């Protein structure tokens, strides 16, 4: 049984207390800003179809972009570890560009830049009967290729954590290099890759809000539109507080899923027990500095 975590208990009790305190402030005592907490609670407890669509789009974009990032990360890591110098140069340049420039600039350039320069017009695409507008395609592509640069370093660190003798033994048994990587090296590297991969997806859920610059109607844009129209207009505090709570809920759900995945993949590095849910949410546990599972993409 895990010991009692006072800091976790304080946070768990403090968040509801803060919300109740805010709910009690039905009016501004100075009479400057007319709070309407019904907007806040309705956005959380009775979300409109528009909010639900924004949540669905946020999660869908995050999952799709993360999958693209993982695929690019695997190829990028293999490229950086390859013996062929063209592959190493290509992978290094890819990581250098997409880790060295702001994601917001990349999103703007890949959508508006390519569109205005008439390099690519981002026409609507129909996938499995679902129409994807151009800005959603551009957003997924931008988030995916940016994430791939960080996943390259994460996958590379995972591969390097596996003893080279494993690959040599597999090759001596007649396995080809791709087969040895797929059957021997990558499964062992998974327990080192999974923790930072989960953290990257947690960050991806929040990073989707940057797609506001190309008008993708994800969760943040949905609340921004609600703030400018109808009965909820000009109530930014209540609306964006509700938006923050929704993002917090999404990342908390993912943290729970991530904790179970890490326990399933392995019992931690070097026999150490993987962090629990409270440790993951509130940072109550001190990690070893030499633990490769804590390697991140260096954001």
Task: Give names to the regions the model predicted.
Residues 2-299:
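Transmembrane alpha-helices and adjacent helix-loop boundaries
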């Amino acid at each position: 049984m895990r010991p009692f975590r006072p800091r976790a208990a304080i946070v768990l009790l403090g968040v509801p207390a803060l919300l109740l305190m805010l709910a009690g402030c039905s009016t501004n005592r100075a009479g400057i800003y007319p709070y309407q907490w019904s907007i806040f609670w309705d956005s959380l407890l009775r979300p409109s179809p528009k909010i639900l669509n924004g949540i669905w789009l946020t999660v869908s974009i995050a999952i799709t972009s993360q999958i693209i990032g993982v695929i690019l990360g695997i190829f990028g890591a293999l490229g950086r570890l390859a013996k062929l110098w063209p592959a190493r140069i290509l992978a290094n340049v890819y990581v250098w560009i997409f880790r060295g420039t702001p994601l917001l600039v990349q999103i703007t350039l890949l959508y508006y830049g390519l569109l205005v320069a008439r390099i690519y017009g981002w026409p609507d695409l129909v996938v499995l009967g679902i129409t994807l507008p151009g800005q959603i395609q551009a957003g997924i592509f931008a988030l995916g290729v940016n994430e791939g640069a960080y996943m390259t370093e994460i996958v590379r660190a995972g591969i390097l954590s596996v003893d080279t003798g494993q690959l040599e033994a597999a090759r001596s048994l007649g396995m080809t290099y791709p087969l040895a990587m797929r059957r021997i090296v990558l499964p062992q590297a998974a327990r080192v890759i999974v923790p930072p991969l989960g953290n990257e997806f947690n960050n991806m859920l929040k990073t989707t809000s940057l797609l506001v610059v190309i008008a993708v109607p994800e969760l943040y844009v949905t609340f921004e539109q609600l703030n400018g129209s109808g009965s909820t207009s000009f109530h930014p505090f209540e609306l964006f507080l509700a938006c923050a709570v929704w993002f917090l809920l999404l990342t908390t759900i993912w943290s729970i899923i991530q904790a179970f995945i890490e326990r399933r993949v392995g019992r931690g590095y070097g026999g150490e027990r993987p962090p629990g849910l409270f440790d993951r949410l509130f940072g109550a546990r001190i990690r070893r500095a030499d633990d490769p599972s804590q390697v991140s993409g260096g954001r």
